[in-house]
Structures are given as structure tokens and as C-alpha cells.
Amino acid sequence: MSIILSLETSCDESAAALVSNEKGKIDLLANEIASQIDEHANWGGVVPEIASRRHLENLPFLIEEVFAKSTLQIKDIDAVAATVTPGLAGSLLVGSITARTLANLHQIPFLGIHHLEGHLSSIYLSENHPKPPFLVLLVSGGHTELIKVDVKHKYQRLGRSHDDAAGEAFDKVARLLGLSYPGGPAIQKIAKSGDPKKFLFPKGRVSKPEGGFYPYDFSFSGLKTAVFRQIEKIRSENKKLPIEDIAASFEYIVAEVLVERSFKCALDQGLNSLVLVGGVAANVRLREMMLAKASKNSIDITLAPMEFCTDNAAMIGAAALLRLSSEGFKSSMELGVSARWPLEKSDSLYDPIPPF
């Protein structure tokens, strides 16, 4: 059995967790998160400098808390893991330096984890999870991707957003409607009392240079523009803005596009298992539409547990345990951080000569 202390500081959530594996099962021993949402809401989005400063303040207390709740001590852990890419560089540095310092002091391995691999690994924190190969729809504030997962951490990106990520579109449309940050929960709340078929917003497509469309790719910038124009039209007519209906119609079309292209990709690729992870995976309408579509197709659907959809350290620990237990992976103490790094190159985070 291995026990890992994991840290997550890629954006605006400071998090620490202790995870272990026994008999092939990942157990969460302790999990703590300090959210900065209220502070960043004053600015309408994440302020990188504020985020990194809060990580510096929060992380020591979170680490103390997970050890206190688990009754473990630092001498009991076998490795330390932290998110090193992608994310806000200043925020990533806080978690990475903390993890490497602890690993050096106690002479145990350090694992630098790709943030998206963490999201993919969140499904292993539930009782039932699929075995590779399977297709993942990873949908969050910064990413909207369709990823094929094969054995031994082999990833192939089959679809992506060419502009705004879905979560980013939620934030921008919420701002247009005068709703609070973050936009996802705000739109979901008000959309409950709206008509999702009131406005027929467009399903963005991405054109190929040679003609036609990329079948599994996404584009949400045109949808955002369509919402803006609809709002302007209604205001120009001096009518009351039907915020609930606009929110519901926007939420519905985003969910429909995500579901349609995910299932098309899975069926075309001959994959009978589809997984939904990421912050936007907490959206109730999206989860319901995924389950409804799955019931009409010969595809098994796995939804990330609600508590592990948004950024957390438990999923980083799960990813680290899978790396450590399968191949004995560990990262160089010289590994730095990077704001961007392809998931397909995540194996390079464990090279003797680090990629950054």
C-alpha cells in the first residue's frame, strides 16, 4: 500500500489531500479545499497575483489539516505530488515548490501531475469506474476536449474547442446577463425557471480548410455572440429581458452540443464507454442529458462524482497513485511548471531530464 500527499494550486482553489491504494482500490483519507471564489468574484474572474498569494497563505494550513484529520504523520507517506501544468504559472509554483521541498526533506519521491490527467483520474475516486479503452469528455473553465484513454496512460485527443472552453462561455454569458461569477452555477440556478426552447441559439461548428466540418470539435464564441445580439435586440425593443429563458436556452444548447458530439465520437471510434469529468461536469442538465442519451445507445456512461468535478487535490492524488503503482513513475526534483503542456506528452513529466 502507498500513501501520497497531493497538492492542487493550478488556478484559484488551494487544495491538499491524502490518498492511498490497497487491493487496487484508491481510498481518500483526507481532503481539504480553500476556495477563493468570493474574492475573485469582486473582479469578475480570477486575478493571477491574488490567486498565488492566497495559495501561499492557505497551503500550509491545508496540509496540517489533512494530516490532523487522517491521524497520519509526514513520516507515513510514500510520495508527494503536485499539479505542475497547465495553469497559472505563479499558482502552480506554490504547489510545486511546496511538494518538492517536502519530498527533498523527507527523501521520498516527487510526482509532477498534469492537471487534465488529474481530472481524468477523478473517476477512480468512485466505486465503479471503467477500464480502458474509453472516451472522456473533459469540460471545464479552461478546456473542452474529447480524449481517448488507452492502457498505460496513453492519451489521444480526438476533439477540442477552437476558441472558448464551455466553462469560459458560461462565465461570459453570465456576465452579459448580469449574473455573478462563476457563471456555471449562476446560470444553472436561474435556468431552472426558464424555457430551454425559447431561443434557438446556434450550434457552433469548426470548418475544415478543404471543406466540411471537424466532427468532434467545438466552438462557443459564436454562441456567445448570438446571446449578446439577442440581448441587444430585446433591449432595443424596450422589452423586459427574459433572463431565465435566455439562460435556460443557452445552457440547453451547450449541453446538447457536448452530448451529441461526445456520443458521435464514441460510436465512430467503436468505444462503448464514455466518461464525463471537469468542472462543467457538475452541471445537472448536462448530466441528465448524458444519462438520457446513454440509455438510448449501447454505451456505458460514467459521471465524475459531483464533489470531484471542480479542482481538488484528491484527483491529483489518484493520478499520482496510478503512476506510482503501475510503473513506479517519479519526477525529477528539477521539474518546473508550465502554463501549457499537451496531455499527450504527460509521460515526459517523469523523464530524468525534465521538459521544463
UniProtKB/Swiss-Prot annotation:
Binds 1 Fe(2+) ion per subunit. The keyword Transferase applies. Required for the formation of a threonylcarbamoyl group on adenosine at position 37 (t(6)A37) in tRNAs that read codons beginning with adenine. Is involved in the transfer of the threonylcarbamoyl moiety of threonylcarbamoyl-AMP (TC-AMP) to the N6 group of A37, together with TsaE and TsaB. TsaD likely plays a direct catalytic role in this reaction. It is found in: Cytoplasm. It is an enzyme of class 2 (transferase). Belongs to the KAE1 / TsaD family. Substrate binds at residues 138-142, 171, 184, 283. Fe cation binds at residues 115, 119, 311. Keywords: Acyltransferase, Cytoplasm, Iron, Metal-binding, Transferase, tRNA processing. It catalyses: L-threonylcarbamoyladenylate + adenosine(37) in tRNA = N(6)-L-threonylcarbamoyladenosine(37) in tRNA + AMP + H(+). Its EC number is 2.3.1.234. This is tRNA N6-adenosine threonylcarbamoyltransferase. GO terms for biological process: tRNA threonylcarbamoyladenosine modification. InterPro entries: ATPase_NBD, Gcp-like_dom, KAE1/TsaD, Peptidase_M22_CS, TsaD. Its cofactor is Fe(2+). One of its GO terms (cellular component) is cytoplasm. One of its GO terms (molecular function) is iron ion binding.
